[in-house]
Every structure is written in C-alpha cells, then in structure tokens.
Amino acid sequence: MKAYWYDNKPGDQREPHDSGRPVTVDYLASIGVQYYHFPSLESVNELAKERGYKNRDEIVVSPQAMGDVYEEKVKMFFNEHLHEDEEIRYIRDGEGYFDVRGQEDEWVRIKLAKDDLIILPAGIYHRFTTDDKNYVKAMRLFQEEPKWTPLNRGPDVDENSHRQSYLRTIQNKTVA
C-alpha cells in the first residue's frame, strides 16, 4: 500500500497522479479508512468473523473479464460516490487505486496491491480505478446480502444521514 495526496493534474485516471506528498496510515485512520496487509486468507477470515462479514464474492476488473463494458465500468467506478455500508476490498491479484476525500475535501490516492485489504467507512466519498495494467482481482466482503449501491455526490447526497454521521465521526480527529 502506498498513500499520497492526489496531484489533480489532467490525464488518465489510471496513471499514478502522485504529488510526491505521502499520506500516513494514521491520517487514513483519522478519516475512518482502515488498512491491513494479509498475506493469508486465514487472516481475512478472522477479520470477517470479528466484524460480522457474512458474505463475500470476487470481482475481476479487466478488459478480458468484462469485455466491451470494461471502459464503461471503470468510468462508473471512478465517479465520486459514497455507500451507506462499509466498503471492504481484499486485493487477490493486480493493483488498483482508491481515492478518498480527506478532511479538507482533497483527494488522497491509495494504491493497493496483492494481499492489501481496505475498509472504507459508510458515508466517505471515494472512487476507484485500476492502474495502467488494467487488471485487479478483488474479494468484496459484506455484512449482509451483497449490494453495491453507489450514491453519486450531489447536494442531496451531502445531506444523507450516513454522510452526516461520517462527518460527525471524523470532525474532531486531526493528524498531520
């Protein structure tokens, strides 16, 4: 895992967009993002049990796996959105980027690779893309029945109860 401030320069979303300013795991924790490196599935299973993740599936994001809809899907994943549930991803193979909004609404880019697991809290604005190799295989974990309902950013979603709860949670946390 490597986290840093996104450079906000125009260009392909799959490029690193590394500003050269690193972000610490402590900062990620201050915005509710949890990161783990689990070389074994056993560790993932233990975390799933502890956190009550009862369901899981796997997704391969690549032109070979998705065919003609790949570009459309990657663009959809990159639309800024939130979920009303935690988003848990365990990277089984390949690499990808999660971008999350920091405390001042700026983008933090998190590069994940094989054996990295990330938990995004409900209510955090984020987006996802593969890297320039166009391939990632990820396990998705869910507390209840698998669902993936993105709420794209907008004034109405800013007022969403899950968004407001998230903002209250991080309000008093500050880490450099």
Curated annotation (Swiss-Prot):
Family designation: Belongs to the acireductone dioxygenase (ARD) family.
Catalytic activity: 1,2-dihydroxy-5-(methylsulfanyl)pent-1-en-3-one + O2 = 4-methylsulfanyl-2-oxobutanoate + formate + 2 H(+); 1,2-dihydroxy-5-(methylsulfanyl)pent-1-en-3-one + O2 = 3-(methylsulfanyl)propanoate + CO + formate + 2 H(+)
Pathway: Amino-acid biosynthesis; L-methionine biosynthesis via salvage pathway; L-methionine from S-methyl-5-thio-alpha-D-ribose 1-phosphate: step 5/6
One Gene Ontology term of the molecular function aspect: nickel cation binding
Organism classification: Eukaryota, Fungi, Dikarya, Ascomycota, Pezizomycotina
Cofactor(s) listed: Fe(2+); Ni(2+)
Top-level taxon in the UniProt lineage: Eukaryota
Protein role: Catalyzes 2 different reactions between oxygen and the acireductone 1,2-dihydroxy-3-keto-5-methylthiopentene (DHK-MTPene) depending upon the metal bound in the active site. Fe-containing acireductone dioxygenase (Fe-ARD) produces formate and 2-keto-4-methylthiobutyrate (KMTB), the alpha-ketoacid precursor of methionine in the methionine recycle pathway. Ni-containing acireductone dioxygenase (Ni-ARD) produces methylthiopropionate, carbon monoxide and formate, and does not lie on the methionine recycle pathway.
Keyword Metal-binding assigned: yes
Any single GO BP term: methionine metabolic process
Segments forming a coiled coil: none
Pfam families per record: ARD
Keywords: Amino-acid biosynthesis, Cytoplasm, Dioxygenase, Iron, Metal-binding, Methionine biosynthesis, Nickel, Nucleus, Oxidoreductase
Residue stretches of biased makeup (Basic and acidic residues): 9-20
Chain residues that bind Fe(2+): H81, H83, E87, H126
Note on cofactor: Binds either 1 Fe or Ni cation per monomer. Iron-binding promotes an acireductone dioxygenase reaction producing 2-keto-4-methylthiobutyrate, while nickel-binding promotes an acireductone dioxygenase reaction producing 3-(methylsulfanyl)propanoate.
GO cellular component: cytoplasm; nucleus
Organism: Aspergillus fumigatus (strain ATCC MYA-4609 / CBS 101355 / FGSC A1100 / Af293) (Neosartorya fumigata)
Residue sites binding Ni(2+) per the record: H81, H83, E87, H126
Protein localization: Cytoplasm; Nucleus
Protein name: Acireductone dioxygenase
Region of interest called Disordered, as start-end residue ranges on this chain: 1-21
EC supergroup of this enzyme: oxidoreductase
CDD domains named in the record: cupin_ARD
Entry keyword annotation includes Cytoplasm: yes
EC number: 1.13.11.54, 1.13.11.53
Record InterPro entries: ARD (IPR004313), ARD_euk (IPR027496), RmlC-like_jellyroll (IPR014710), RmlC_Cupin_sf (IPR011051)
Major localization class: cytoplasm
